[in-house]
Amino acid sequence: MVLTTNLYSLNLRSTFFFTNTITCPTLFTFKLSSVSNPRRVFPNIRAHVSAASSNSELESLLSTDRKLISKQSNNGASSISSGVRLENISKSYEGITVLKDVTWEVKKGEKVGLIGVNGAGKTTQLRIITGQEEPDSGNVIWAKPNLKVAFLSQEFEVSMGKTVKEEFMCTFKEEMEIARKLENLQKAIEEAVDDLELMGKLLDEFDLLQRRAQEVDLDSIHAKISKLMSELGFVSEDADRLVASFSSGWQMRMSLGKILLQNPDLLLLDEPTNHLDLDTIEWLEGYLIKQDVPMVIISHDRAFLDQLCTKIVETEMGVSRTFDGNYSQYVISKAELVEAQYAAWEKQQKEIEATKDLISRLSAGANSGRASSAEKKLEKLQEEELIEKPFQRKQMKIRFPECGLSGRSVVTVKNLVFGFDDKMLFNKANLAIERGEKVAIIGPNGCGKSTLLKLIMGLEKPMRGEVILGEHNVLPNYFEQNQAEAQDLDKTVIETVVEAAVDWRIDDIKALLGRCNFKADMLDRKVSLLSGGEKARLAFCKFMVKPSTLLVLDEPTNHLDIPSKEMLEEAINEYKGTVITVSHDRYFIKQIVNRVIEVRDGGLMDYAGDYNYFLEKNVEARARELEREAELEEKAPKVKAKSKMSKAEREARKKQKMKAFQASKKKSKSSKNAKRWN
């Protein structure tokens, strides 16, 4: 294993990678320009100062500063993008090969989508790049030393007890350390008036630190944070709010923001869209598209991969293969490659069979020489020139068990009013969903999408209005976001699914579990021993086997790989019942829905068409609304608002004005006649 020396990595909790972790300093305001370099004027005053208590602190301050400057002096600018190459990487766990001679690279301007089924070794490759794991063999080759690497893992972490601004400030560990030391040096210089030698050393350190502060642009930190907070959707008032008061989606924005603030040389993203709403995903796409920094993105969000990636690296059965273009181009190229390889394999198999047949016919008598020649040809075909049959994952078809047809009316929402103490979510909202409709509920995080599903399921009660399930044979099957944590921890994996299944053969249940990446040795494992992702996949399997006429799904694709998503999409399209889903996966929504409901401004905006129809009409509606507002504002008279008057008051005022007008006319006429006769 060869790693370029002096690799400078970053580790912001789970967000960044640091070789030496520094405790996040206490937030304080420090402006470099406000700190003047103390003049080297030494007054002729002898002050008796006890240095015993401060000597060790000063020595520590001086030595630390020297180390800090020394450590950073050789760093390249973080704006200079570079790349990394994995060369013949192999990795095994407990005798099971996960990666086998994996080779690929990412360079400046490239955005690599790393894809594969769950457990294929995608995250392992990122961990090898960052040095968190060592490969069994192979090399990681860096294009330059001191490369700054940012890594957003699936399990992001933020400090719940900090404010939003404090959380972002923790990104600037070195800068805050410099600011703290500058402040301490300023105080030390003021106290060292009787020690010329010490003051000289302190001033030298101050000069070094001040230059370093200018290099890291210490003055701009607050402006950078404010700008990015705005881009991420935070308002200025959010800066002093606790991180704990935000939803997981907003906490993910904080983690992303901490990465983006560092301007890394290499950006590694592991499922970055998992907790983001559609608006934020589109913002993130727009932001990342503009960056030249090399990126490696693990994602099962096919629309995200389509928008961003310049090439796709597929890991299958431990082997990697690189395809130019985005995800859609990969799908086409992969199909063509498999087809061509299968045709070549089939042709070679026919040649092998024909050669074997020739050998058997020539083996006897005078043709033994020709038979020997044919045997050599066969040996060469089978050993040196053998074409492997292309691997094709077995496509398992799943169907949701159905219980006949429901009545025409499935869900009715009438004048719904609902909210929480600090926020009203729905204000006289109305909705009617009928049998056979497949509906997507969309909107920004926190607008009430999941709450609407809970109201439909009867898990929440309206403040006013009503939410009614149809009377005839409406049998809902509900998949909620935290369903993974609501399972019986004492049951085994197989017991959990068998309990929910009706009329399923045990072999079919095992096949379903296998398709969701539960190996045979995991079937008897207790649920309590599963990871978060494994619990989520188990909850999905349990959901798939329950009979119903109405599917209610809250972010069902969050922990699914692409083949599992395709399996779910096919099952939903074959389902004759009604489907209501909350999802931020645009590709998934496009495949399954025929109606879109947008939660906006306390109401439910209805788009009677698929997701493309919603995009078309939504843009037009927003544009028309803006045009109307601009037109009304332009035509509106620039006067103060009139006070409210009754009809009788308005009539009286009108008569009064008319009398005043008539009197004014008479007065004007008399005045003119008087002037005329004078």
Curated annotation (Swiss-Prot):
Keyword Repeat attributed: yes
Span of domain ABC transporter: 84-342, 411-626
Superkingdom classification of source: Eukaryota
Biased composition (Basic residues): 653-678
Record field: transmembrane: none
Binding site for ATP: 116-123, 443-450
Residue span of region Disordered: 630-678
Database matches in Gene3D superfamilies: P-loop containing nucleotide triphosphate hydrolases
Matching Pfam families: ABC_tran, ABC_tran_Xtn
Membership in a protein family: Belongs to the ABC transporter superfamily. ABCF family. EF3 (TC 3.A.1.121) subfamily.
The name this protein goes by in its record: ABC transporter F family member 2
Organism, scientific name: Arabidopsis thaliana (Mouse-ear cress)
